[in-house]
From Swiss-Prot:
Transmembrane segments: none annotated. The keyword Signal does not apply. GO terms for cellular component: extracellular region. This is Hyposin-J1. The keyword Secreted applies. Has antimicrobial activity. It comes from Phasmahyla jandaia. Expressed by the skin glands. It is found in: Secreted. Keywords: Amidation, Amphibian defense peptide, Antimicrobial, Secreted.
Amino acid sequence: FRPALIVRTKGK
């Protein structure tokens, strides 16, 4: 899984 994906969801 890409950590960047999680960060983007958190920012949203």
